[in-house]
Amino acid sequence: MNAAPVPRTFRIVGEMQRVDERETPHPMMARGDFGERAQRWRHGRSGDAFVRIFNAGRATDPWNAMAHLFVQAPEGKVNPVVTPVGDPAKMSQQIKEIARFFGADAVGITHLDQAYVYTHRAHAWRGDGTKDGNPITLNHKYAICMGLAGDNDRYMAAPSHIADAHYSMGNTLSMIPAFMLAGYIREMGYPARWHAYNSMDVNPLPLAIMAGLGELGRHGMLIHEEYGSRMHLMVVTTDLPLAVDEPVDLAVEEFCRYCKKCARTCPSRSITFSDVKDVYNGVEKWRINVDSCYMNRVAVNHNCLYCTTSCCYNKKPGVWYHTLAMGLLKKTPLRLRPLVVRPLVWMDDLFWGKRPHVGMKWLDYDSDPPDGTCDVPGCVALHRPQHKKRLQRPGPEAPSRLYPSDRPVSVS
């Protein structure tokens, strides 16, 4: 029996304080904290119609983007007739089944820790008359955490317009299960609020970890047992009586400590090679450099996704070799796991490559354009495709700074 405390990749070692959503990466980029070029990339009109319909801020008309419709919808009223709940455990099972019916691929439930509720909104939304910077009050008891998995093959075509379109489609589709589940619970007579892409009052990642959806990887993302790192996270907070789940142990601590494949493939050196974790806002974890990560996205004009596609946990769901590897990892005692991890990483490099990539053509898009082709508007420089460049080695990491999101803020 493995008696180590979980979650071991997200160890709470001190006091956590709430964070202002305005001091998280996307709002910071939008207001120019990452520089004028990044701000233009965030708001500039794209020449690609897929980019425009998935990003209201870059569209000819924001109402052409479905996500804009969702975020402008007001929160529905709670049915005054309450459906009694006799068994919270049974209700939890029913809610999970309903969430999957609405489109979620993974569901878990945890208590809503106020440390993961943002202090202020970055953007006005929900059509409820709120303004940018309004304080957030969210006193619900539970958080229903859901994940929507991306298609493995199209993710493997990154960085490309093909992978970008699929990634953005996942962001948009993730709103549907959250929106519908919150409405379903309100019709049962209980308050509920949905939180999904571009519409978050909570930080979904730590909640998903506590709800047992997966563990935190070296690359700073959730690793799910079946879907790896390609999960779009959404949350519904509510007072509906529910039974909560426990965090899981997927051997991510041992695997990430040795593997470092995401660090080797990261073109901007934004993922640390260090075996020593850092403590930020009371949590011990591996830290990524958000500045260099975002600026690389601007430089290549794509969502990079190498940290997602290179993750050894990222395989097609249900394949026998992944099921076998996961079973072996989970059943191996903690002290012996490094002996299992090393050959698994070696086999992953052998069969899927040290920098996994799938060539793909779709519509007029090609994930493997000829050398010298650049997607950045106006660029005429000769380039090698990202997946053909040299892998990173341990060495000096990209310059970093203390991001405002890592500095606790006082809650008045």
Label each PLM-derived region with a short phrase.
Residues 105-331:
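Catalytic cores of enzyme domains
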Residues 74, 80, 84, 88, ...:
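Proline-rich intrinsically disordered, low-complexity coils
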Residues 1-12, 277-412:
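Flanking helices and flexible, charged tails adjoining ferredoxin-like Fe-S electron-transfer domains
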Residues 1-154, 160-161:
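Non-catalytic, usually N-terminal nucleic-acid engagement modules in DNA/RNA processing proteins
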Residues 51-55, 85-87, 106, 175, ...:
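A composition-driven signal for long, intrinsically disordered, charge-rich low-complexity tracts
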Residues 82-85, 134, 226, 352-361:
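Flavin (FAD/FMN)-binding glycine-rich loop and adjacent Rossmann-like elements that form
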